[in-house]
A protein has these predicted regions:
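Transmembrane signal-anchor helices characteristic of membrane glycosylation enzymes that use polyprenol
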Residues: 1-15, 197-209
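Short acidic/glycine- and proline-prone juxtamembrane loop motifs at membrane-interface regions
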Residues: 107-121
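Transmembrane-helix motifs of polytopic, lipid-linked glycan transferases
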Residues: 68-89, 127
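Membrane-interface alpha helices of multi-pass inner-membrane proteins
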Residues: 110, 145-160
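Loop-to-helix entry region of an early transmembrane alpha helix in multi-pass inner-membrane enzymes
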Residues: 46, 50, 59-76, 111
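Membrane-interface transmembrane helices that cradle and orient dolichyl/undecaprenyl
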Residues: 86-87, 128-146
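Transmembrane-lumen/periplasm boundary regions of multi-pass, lipid-linked membrane glycan transferases
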Residues: 21, 155, 159, 164-259
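Extracytoplasmic catalytic/substrate-binding loops of multi-pass membrane glycan-assembly enzymes
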Residues: 6-23, 30-33, 39-51, 61-64, ...
Length: 259
């Protein structure tokens, strides 16, 4: 239903900013030094906007086709939630339920239009987490898995900076190390460090490029964003209470299961 109605949904403020920047990539060629209404727009990494612009380039420049990459990422997120659950020794039946819950969660669907950067940051991070388990299960450094994890970590960084590292990746590492026995802790640590180093290189080049090409504007925006995170972006703990009900209809059986 979401896929069929993507073209008629109202555009949110954050989504409009993404679409304007994507449109200016196509019309003005501002792929690296991103802009919004002709003004520098460096507050957000460009990967989700690139994907929206590429989709519009190959199909049509409208809201529907610029939303398609986010819709595809929802499907990928559900698929990898299923695969991750199954890899963690959970039955196929329960893993399918996990994937279905992801696909039908109100919050997952909502952030495609409410926060288009988030769905990509967390989607790519979930892929990185899935492949990182292959690192944990090898007693020696496996470069193939290290590279795959590093690439998807960098995609997450190019979608919304380090947010998903703090929200998903590092908590997952802590939980996994506590619960599961590792064949070789030293090898695992080195593999993760190599993946993080690769992610830093692949995910940080755009920031360095913009800083080099437009230093004054980049530093001014960075200073303003830093100030925002210490002022109006600070929320009281009860601000996040609504997250418990953002699974939509699945909040009801989840609540009943706790009784």
């Amino acid at each position: 239903m979401f896929g069929l109605n993507m073209g008629v949904l109202d555009t949110t403020i954050m989504e409009a900013r993404n679409f304007i920047t994507a449109r200016e990539m196509l019309l003005d060629g501002n792929w690296l030094l991103t802009t919004m209404n002709g003004e520098p727009r460096y507050q957000k990494p460009p990967l989700p906007t690139w994907l929206a612009a590429i989709s519009a380039f190959f199909f049509e420049l409208n809201n529907y086709w610029m939303r398609i990459p986010g819709f595809v990422m929802v499907i990928i997120l559900a698929l990898y939630n299923y695969r991750l659950s199954h890899k963690l020794f959970i039955s196929r039946h329960l893993s399918l339920i996990h994937g279905f819950l992801t696909l039908t969660s109100f919050y997952i669907i909502g952030i495609v239009i409410e926060a288009p950067w988030d769905i990509f940051a967390h989607g790519f991070m979930l892929i990185a987490i899935y492949h990182s388990i292959n690192i944990f299960s090898h007693p020696v450094i496996n470069l193939k898995n290290v590279i795959i994890v590093g690439i998807f970590l960098s995609f997450s960084a190019m979608s919304k900076g380090p947010v998903s590292f703090y929200v998903l990746f590092f908590p997952f590492l802590i939980a996994y190390f506590v619960i599961f026995k590792l064949p070789d802790l030293k090898t695992t640590v080195w593999s993760i460090l190599l993946s993080l180093l690769l992610a830093l290189v692949l995910g940080g080049w755009w920031y360095l490029y913009v800083q080099y090409q437009d230093t004054e504007t980049f530093l001014a925006i960075t200073k303003k964003e830093t100030s925002n995170w210490s002022s109006y972006n600070v929320r009281p703990f009860y601000y996040y209470w609504s997250f418990f009900v953002q699974s939509g209809i699945w909040t009801i059986p989840a609540f009943i299961s706790l009784i």
